[in-house]
Structures are given as structure tokens and as C-alpha cells.
UniProtKB/Swiss-Prot annotation:
<feature type="binding site">
    <location>
        <position position="112"/>
    </location>
    <ligand>
        <name>tRNA</name>
    </ligand>
</feature>
<keyword id="KW-0378">Hydrolase</keyword>
<feature type="site" description="Stabilizes the basic form of H active site to accept a proton">
    <location>
        <position position="91"/>
    </location>
</feature>
<comment type="subunit">
    <text>Monomer.</text>
</comment>
<dbReference type="GO" id="GO:0006515">
    <property type="term" value="P:protein quality control for misfolded or incompletely synthesized proteins"/>
</dbReference>
<dbReference type="InterPro" id="IPR001328">
    <property type="entry name" value="Pept_tRNA_hydro"/>
</dbReference>
<keyword id="KW-0963">Cytoplasm</keyword>
<comment type="similarity">
    <text>Belongs to the PTH family.</text>
</comment>
<feature type="site" description="Discriminates between blocked and unblocked aminoacyl-tRNA">
    <location>
        <position position="9"/>
    </location>
</feature>
<dbReference type="GO" id="GO:0005737">
    <property type="term" value="C:cytoplasm"/>
</dbReference>
<dbReference type="GO" id="GO:0004045">
    <property type="term" value="F:peptidyl-tRNA hydrolase activity"/>
</dbReference>
<dbReference type="InterPro" id="IPR018171">
    <property type="entry name" value="Pept_tRNA_hydro_CS"/>
</dbReference>
<feature type="binding site">
    <location>
        <position position="64"/>
    </location>
    <ligand>
        <name>tRNA</name>
    </ligand>
</feature>
<comment type="function">
    <text>Hydrolyzes ribosome-free peptidyl-tRNAs (with 1 or more amino acids incorporated), which drop off the ribosome during protein synthesis, or as a result of ribosome stalling.</text>
</comment>
<keyword id="KW-0820">tRNA-binding</keyword>
<feature type="active site" description="Proton acceptor">
    <location>
        <position position="19"/>
    </location>
</feature>
<comment type="function">
    <text>Catalyzes the release of premature peptidyl moieties from peptidyl-tRNA molecules trapped in stalled 50S ribosomal subunits, and thus maintains levels of free tRNAs and 50S ribosomes.</text>
</comment>
């Protein structure tokens, strides 16, 4: 069994913000796996599907970003899953906009959702689908930037990025993070 977590904030005021790309990818992964968010457990919305012969739970924590780890930690404990069974999808200020990268472990880079997940699951050694949102303009607070919506001109590249991020999460489930990283990150490098 695998757990894929899309990080984001609940509520319509946060829909389609940079900080909610994890939720957007979770929605697309659920659609691809013919799963629906019908279960409410662990202070989250859950959808159950199958990929690569594996049972997959897709989670959207409803705790707000800074407390996402509470939901993730509870689910891992309940299902007796290890960090190798976890894939987290999140926005990343350090990656250029619309770039997708798969990695295992590493620092939280100031991302409060990742800080919370790390604290509640016992460390950072899980697969992450990083979705680049770029840096804020000079003198703009990064918190305001990530809570801002994408511009209309960004809709086409955003949709393409979400397709690639969804595929990265699916490959991490089906192939394991190490093999999936070779494919995902090679494609990302070739794309520029």
C-alpha cells in the first residue's frame, strides 16, 4: 500500500494558489486512478485507487499547511506504513516555475508543510514531487507569493506541469522512487 499526499490549504479562497499545487496534483491523480475523495479520516480527504498492482490512498490534509504532518503521521501509523510508502507533492520556491522534480529526503527549504510532515513521520526520508513555483518578486513576502493565484497567462504551462507532476507521483508508486527519479528528472533536464 502507498500513501500519496498533496499538500495545500482547504477552502475556496486557497484554490489554485501556488501553495495548493499539491491538492491540484492529488485531484488529477485521483482522476487518473478512477478514485474519488469520498472518505474523511485523519483530518483529511481520502481517495482510494490502484496503481501498478498497489493499493493507493491519495490524501489532501484539511488541517492547513502548517499542520499537514498531523494527518500524514496518523495515516502512516494507522496503516503501519513506512517512509518508503509515502509520496508527498508540494510547491517549491527554489525550482523555476512549472519545473517538476522527484527526490527522496533532503531539507524542508523553509516549507512549513514539509516541516510538519517531517516532524510527524520521523524524518525527511520519503519521496517528494517538487513542483516549481519560482521565487517571489523583489520585496514581496514569500508567504504572500505562495498564497497568490497563478496569472491567466500561466494556465497552459501550469496544466502541462500538473500533468508531469501527476505522472511523477504515479511513477514513484509504480516503479519506486529511485527508478522513477531517473525517468522524471531526466525528462525535466531535457525539457530545460
Amino acid at each position: 500500500m502507498k500513501l500519496v499526499v498533496g499538500l495545500g490549504n482547504p477552502g475556496p479562497e486557497y484554490a489554485r494558489t501556488r501553495h495548493n499545487v499539491g491538492f491540484l496534483v492529488a485531484d488529477r491523480l485521483a482522476l487518473a486512478l478512477r478514485a474519488e475523495f469520498t472518505l474523511r479520516k485523519f483530518a483529511s480527504e481520502l481517495a482510494e485507487g490502484r496503481a501498478g498492482g498497489e493499493r493507493v490512498w491519495i490524501m489532501k490534509p484539511q488541517t492547513y499547511m502548517n499542520h499537514s504532518g498531523e494527518s500524514v503521521g496518523s495515516a502512516l501509523h494507522f496503516w503501519k506504513l513506512g517512509l518508503e510508502d509515502l509520496v508527498v507533492v508540494h510547491d517549491d520556491l527554489e525550482l523555476e516555475p512549472f519545473r517538476v522534480q522527484l527526490k527522496v529526503g533532503g531539507g524542508h527549504g523553509g516549507h512549513n508543510g514539509l516541516k510538519s510532515v517531517n516532524a510527524h513521520v520521523g524524518g525527511p526520508d520519503y519521496a517528494r514531487v517538487r513542483v516549481g513555483v519560482g521565487r517571489p518578486p523583489p520585496r514581496m513576502d514569500p508567504a504572500d507569493y505562495v498564497l497568490g493565484r497563478f496569472a491567466k497567462a500561466d494556465e497552459a504551462p501550469l496544466e502541462e506541469c500538473l500533468v508531469r507532476a501527476t505522472e511523477a507521483a504515479r511513477l514513484a508508486i509504480e516503479l519506486g522512487a529511485a527508478k522513477a527519479m531517473n525517468q522524471v528528472n531526466r525528462r525535466a533536464s531535457a525539457a530545460g
